[in-house]
Amino acid sequence: MENSDVTDALDEAGRSFERSPENVEEGLDVEEAELVQLRRACRLLAAASRLLDDGYYTVVIESSFVAIERTIQFRLVHDGAMSASEVISSHRRLYQRGAEIGLYGDAFGERLAELWNQNRTKTYYRLGIATEAQAESMRELATQIHADLVGASRVKHECLC
């Protein structure tokens, strides 16, 4: 990149991750990996609600899918079905793992995977334009899944929602 402002910004961004943490985001400064996933999901849901009010439907849909996945990941780690360092890069595989440990049935996991496959990609890559109704329904789905999975855990008091 020839624009020095951009390369300077890239350099500064890299340095910002190398410095000692200051002014960290409240609520996410927990030691347990499962709680980091839980609280990230909480923040994604809060952000989705705010962005929905501002009409940012594409981001609400994206945040809702990620909140669902962080919540499932929280339960996988919490229930000992996944190590904190394990990475599941396939969205479908993550939904399947949730079904395998009984967080929900196989059919529900498959429906989540299909919802992601058919709609998240379409919205994200602008093959379709996000609507308010889609954003609202995705946020509601993410909120309901989060409440159900967190409510059935031993650490529901750690939720920031």
Label the model's feature ranges:
Residues 1-161:
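Terminal alpha-helical segments
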